[in-house]
Amino acid sequence: MKRELLYEMRFKLMLDENMVTMLAKNKIDFPSTGEISNPNIHGKVDGIYYMLLQPNGEANTRSRGLITVDGGGIVFMDAWGFVRYEANGRFVLHESITHKASKQELAWLNCVQGTVDGFIDGTTGELEANVFKVAVKVKDHL
C-alpha cells in the first residue's frame, strides 16, 4: 500500500549527553527544534520530547510542539509511539501523530491521522522522519 507523504521533519533534540546514556536513567525529556517541509506546508517547529525506557530496551515516546507555518498560522502537533535502539547510537522511530491548526487554510491537517517513520541519531540528537497520512477522521467533516 502506497502511503501519502504529508511532510518531512528535521529536528534537533537538545541533548545534554549521549541519548544511550540518558535512557539508562529510565525517563528523559528535552526540548526540540526543527523544521517541516512539503509543497503544502513548510515551517519551524518548537516542542518537547519525552521518553520512558521499557524493560525490553525500547522507549515509549511522546512529543508535543508548535509548527509556525511560513506565511502565517500555528499548528499544534501531538505524537506518541516508540523508539528502538538499532546500532551505532541510532534509534528507529515509529509514532502516531495528530494536528490542530489555527487557520482555515491549514484545517485539512485537523482531520488527518498520521504515522511517523524515521530515526534519531543518539549521539547528535538529530531526528529525521517522514509523516504519512493514514486516515481521515470522519467526525471532523460533519
Residue ranges and their predicted role:
Residues 1-142:
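Beta-strand-enriched cores of mature, soluble protein domains
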